[in-house]
Amino acid sequence: MQRSPLEKASVVSKLFFSWTRPILKKGYRQRLELSDIYQIPSADSADNLSEKLEREWDRELASKKNPKLINALRRCFFWRFMFYGILLYLGEVTKAVQPLLLGRIIASYDPDNKTERSIAIYLGIGLCLLFIVRTLLLHPAIFGLHHIGMQMRIAMFSLIYKKTLKLSSRVLDKISIGQLVSLLSNNLNKFDEGLALAHFVWIAPLQVALLMGLIWELLQASVFCGLGFLIVLALFQAGLGRMMMKYRDQRAGKINERLVITSEMIENIQSVKAYCWEEAMEKMIENLRQTELKLTRKAAYVRYFNSSAFFFSGFFVVFLSVLPYALIKGIILRKIFTTISFCIVLRMAVTRQFPWAVQTWYDSLGAINKIQDFLQKQEYKTLEYNLTTTEVVMENVTAFWEEGFGELFEKAKQSNNNRKTSNGHDNLFFSNFSLLGTPVLKDINFKIERGQLLAVAGSTGAGKTSLLMMIMGELEPSEGKIKHSGRISFCSQFSWIMPGTIKENIIFGVSYDEYRYRSVIKACQLEEDISKFAEKDNIVLGEGGITLSGGQRARISLARAVYKDADLYLLDSPFGYLDVLTEKEIFESCVCKLMANKTRILVTSKMEHLKKADKILILHEGSSYFYGTFSELQNLRPDFSSKLMGYDSFDQFSSERRNSILTETLRRFSLEGDAPVSWTETKKQSFKQTGEFGEKRKNSILNSINSIRKFSIVHKTPLQMNGIEEDSDEPSERRLSLIPDSEQGEAILPRISVINTGPALQVRRRQSVLNMMTHSVNQGQSVHRKTTASTRKVSLAPQANLTELDIYSRRLSQETGLEISEEINEEDLKECFFDDMESIPAVTTWNTYLRYITLHKSLIFVLIWCLVIFLAEVAASLVVLWLLGNTSFQDKGNSTYSRNNSYAVIITNTSSYYVFYIYVGVADTLLALGFFRGLPLVHTLITVSKILHHKMLHSVLQAPMSTLNTLKAGGILNRFSKDIAILDDLLPLTIFDFIQLLLIVIGAIAVVSVLQPYIFLATVPVIAAFILLRAYFLQTSQQLKQLESAGRSPIFTHLVTSLKGLWTLRAFGRQPYFETLFHKALNLHTANWFLYLSTLRWFQMRIEMIFVIFFIAVTFISILTTGEGEGTVGIILTLAMNIMSTLQWAVNSSIDVDSLMRSVSRVFKFIDMPTEGKPTKSTKAYKNGQLSKVMIIENSHVKKDDIWPSGGQMTIKDLTAKYIEGGNAILENISFSISPGQRVGLLGRTGSGKSTLLSAFLRLLNTEGEIQIDGVSWDSVTLQQWRKAFGVIPQKVFIFTGTFRKNLDPYEQWSDQEVWKVADEVGLRSVIEQFPGKLDFVLVDGGCVLSHGHKQLMCLARSVLSKAKILLLDEPSAHLDPVTYQIIRRALKQAFADCTVILCEHRIEAMLECQQFLVIEENKVRQYDSIQKLLNEKSLFQQAISHSDRVKLFPHRNSSKYKSRPQIASLKEETEEEVQETRL
């Protein structure tokens, strides 16, 4: 970054913001880079500001029982805040005084008062000086208040982050990431931009009092008619606002529901294509969109009327103020024009400035209270350690994760026991509470000496991780004692990678020791991986390790723990993502050799690890099931494998036990405090099973291992499904969390490809921070996108006499939408994370505008209609101008107002009714035309938004995976959430505002030019200057906003990264270092934001200066060239003030339109994506010259003779696959053949290309070569026909929000009887029947109430229903317990006995049924043979098998005597799905 010119700028340069000219000039000429941004002043650095506020907050905590954060803020910022407030008040006073001078200038043209004509020139100078003074006061005041707001935000940002690092784990378990992000974005943004409005809470009342006094001198008591109208208008708009909120709350549910399905579609786009569900998903989303648009239109119409009411109130407030006085006493022109100017200022103060100020204070104080409560939460307390201790001892330790744990569930039980099903039975969700009040650890005892290895094992939820947390001090024991030295190193069960190099991640702030570093690298099997990078271990890893696989991240995390020289090493399931061979080598070389002299506690379920451990501790439901050696375990607990590792069959449990299991599963997702609801209602509600979890902790069942991102939406009211929605008295609440998840090779936050080895965004319930910390981070990280842009407040339509501050206020209202409820109005996704999915030009191109306008055939006609209506309004206004300009020549004998002022009288006794009728007629005309002229435009623009959404959705679903691989999941979801919300809400009214303002300016210029042609000559260069200035500023401002967005992303990225690795940070004591990194991220964002504020102020001030110059010219031209007639001067000066303020706002509005049209540009980019290819060969060459019915069975009535494929034979020739066109080959020259009905297993190490081969079979990649199925080539049929030949069980199971039946048969081709039959075949029937509504039970959050095994059975049922002849299985047993695995094996034998099966597996025993095996190494086929031949040859396959005890199963593979598995073969490896369900 460069040094800021502000440091050496003069006072004049600072006053006029001239120091920003270099960056403006550079941005206009070329693309700005981060290096072009100026350094921030030292006073704005996060270090200084946070230290200042932290000092005052500590002082507040120490001095009072009830500390107030606002007091600390007051001591830091109050005096500067008040100084700029006084400047702002003085600027507003000048605005109130201007009408007085205008009235005196008009009075000087009174024919009977020629003595004052000579002072008109001086009055004009005074009026112009007022404008100059106001400009010099207003802009520094606004900038200063912005600056203070920015400093307050930075200081509180830092304070919140520091507090986050200190929070206890119990507190972290009660709050969600969404709440933290909201605290840092939504709440603090209120200070950043809203502070400029805060002073109007006292300025506006003073201004109203001053104006009322001045108008009283003109109109006396009739002024209260105008004031009363403004008050009624404010109440009317408040009523419209409530109506708009009602529609908005209803619409929020529909938006959430659509985005739920959309995000699930994006997350699982590869599965959607594999299942050929494009049409079903498109229809489902479009149906939801239709319902949403109905409410969108209603809300838009209400906002439009609200906007129109304010715009046209200016005419009526003058009309009602003047008319009573005029009818009684008559009135002169001077009073009319003076009153018009006064009423404009009065209207803004009453209906805008004061309500906005009150709202700002309300929101700000609410935000301060929330932050204050957060800062007072319980902090993490380190345990007292004995540094001389060499042993680790735990005596009679009992612990709870939450105090009052039992009370929480007692309350839930009491609340939900009142629920009854429709037939009177107890609600299934809460029929059993066996786990209420259970401690996470109970009476734990063990002792290990220095250098010993303790292996901790146990079933899911046994408390293994909690045991390590208690040793680390993260969990405080309620009973018992813990004794160890305190020098701890820790490796989490989910690898955590911080942004930086591999070396920095391993060393992690510890002093560098070359020999130790190399030894650790070698022991953790990282040498080969590091050698592949050009930068070796200095390669910079993205957030979460974007360039690494899951196994590499796991080994780096282990290396970090091993590198630190500690007395005690806590290793929490470090081998979960390693293949058998790598795991074996690392365990031997690292855990057993390199760390042989260290005390180690290893959480594992591997039998090999238990055998080599000095001591074994097996936990069961938080209690110690066994403690001793392995030989003692075999003698004392021979049944430990079946009892603790889940080997019992669910179907063999008693009915009470089955009910308890299901109850516990469902209980975790039940809605606390819901009103009673019947199951018949439940099946009509798509989200009844989830909801707001309140502030109390609920146990978590997290989603599967391969989720990359989770899109969390929690809604207090049930969302609509099938057009039915339950009424609720509570407002809808929308919360979105940033809950990082993971997938191989993927990055944290937005920098993730849509498809790599997993999906992108998954809808799920809100998670606590603790759950996020204990969630998988090995697979890519999740970003929870906030989707509330569509619910923001939309500003009211501008009026003709806005000041720059008024314009800013309206811009603030439009952009930020300050709402009382943070949950409803959490900032949009892009407010927190930069969406850099593609490069959009800094300024929207004309082609985008043209394409947008021509998208709907009616839009052009609607624009012409608006122009015609405007001309009619101009004609009506000319009637008033004619009246004002000509009534001064009435016969003075008709005057009763003044005997000597005949030319000044316009209202007389004889003409009063005539004039009254004219005013009423004009008012009615303006009211009718103004209220309804924009409705067709708003309606049509929403229709255009509907068309764009439909085209974009269709384009995404039909786009090839090679294109989607180049996109980021966050970018896709942003198009459907943020950009569609802009198209629905902001763009229609913003375009209407701009068109309206533009026409007003044109009309006013035309009128003034007719009255005084010389003024037209002054107008032309001014308009040209505005246009040039806009073009000059727009290039730089848009780039600065992009850089600011890019600078915002690291702040929230760092927050999420820190929280995910918080236990590691504390174990290593790296909190100060991460605070420094956070301050750097804040300073980077501050540099961009401060420069944007400065350049914006430069632009606004230059507009104001041009306006002042123009007004000076108009004033003196009108004074010097106008002869008799005060009416002409009054019209010219009044309209001149209106022209420039309106033109000023029109320029700003055009900038807003350009900014919003960038959303249209991004949508067009998606619409223009290529579509998947069509057949390139004729189908007539097959089967005797004719391919009979190239189709898959899609209903049960198709004759077998007409079915393709009929046998399932596959021939693969020279298959080469790439993720993207022109990229590196990920499969090369693959050739082999599969006989009909044969079962083929794919073998190879992680990353060898097994899953990629299955994707290539489905034509999901860029492929070359040829594949034939039963003689039909893949380029001879459509993609839909080809993919329907396969049944698929993917690695990432796709369960979308909908009923069981919809998930099994989305096209609704099969009857309930047929679905039940298939469910019975695959073992799903007993599961589905446990749920209320059975097939109509609505699954949400990716099927969160189902185990991963049940989800796999769902996929198996889909394949059975498809009647596919070829079945592709990608790691189907990766997360299965033995029981579910046996169900799948049985179903495969029965339902797919005559089908071709291709199986990709890591577990050797899962592939015993395969006849042939394809070994893939380095993206090529190395071997393709039977299992016996592979074992007899030297190969990687034989090497891996030799290291597994399961090899003894192979001799029995074909033996009829083999009936059962050995009782103790292996402890089941705890998979991520199970870990996610762990109740710590």
UniProtKB/Swiss-Prot annotation:
The modification Phosphothreonine is found at residue 717. There is a cross-link at residue 688 (Glycyl lysine isopeptide (Lys-Gly) (interchain with G-Cter in ubiquitin)). The keyword Repeat applies. Residues 1452-1480 are annotated as: Disordered. A motif (PDZ-binding) lies at residues 1478-1480. N-glycosylated. Phosphorylated; cAMP treatment promotes phosphorylation and activates the channel. Dephosphorylation decreases the ATPase activity (in vitro). Phosphorylation at PKA sites activates the channel. Phosphorylation at PKC sites enhances the response to phosphorylation by PKA. Phosphorylated by AMPK; this inhibits channel activity. InterPro entries: AAA+_ATPase (IPR003593), ABC1_TM_dom (IPR011527), ABC1_TM_sf (IPR036640), ABC_transporter-like_ATP-bd (IPR003439), ABC_transporter-like_CS (IPR017871), ABC_transporter_C-like (IPR050173), CFTR/ABCC7 (IPR009147), CFTR1_ATP-bd_dom1 (IPR047082). Its EC number is 5.6.1.6. CDD domains: ABC_6TM_CFTR_D1 (cd18594), ABC_6TM_CFTR_D2 (cd18600), ABCC_CFTR1 (cd03291), ABCC_CFTR2 (cd03289). Residues 423-646, 1210-1443 form the ABC transporter domain. Residues 1-77, 147-195, 244-298, 359-858, 940-990, 1035-1095, 1152-1480 are cytoplasmic. Residues 81-365, 859-1155 form the ABC transmembrane type-1 domain. Monomer; does not require oligomerization for channel activity. May form oligomers in the membrane. Interacts with SLC26A3, SLC26A6 and NHERF1. Interacts with SHANK2. Interacts with MYO6. Interacts (via C-terminus) with GOPC (via PDZ domain); this promotes CFTR internalization and thereby decreases channel activity. Interacts with SLC4A7 through NHERF1. Found in a complex with MYO5B and RAB11A. Interacts with ANO1. Interacts with SLC26A8. Interacts with AHCYL1; the interaction increases CFTR activity. Interacts with CSE1L. This is Cystic fibrosis transmembrane conductance regulator. It comes from Plecturocebus moloch. The lineage of its organism: Eukaryota, Metazoa, Chordata, Craniata, Vertebrata.
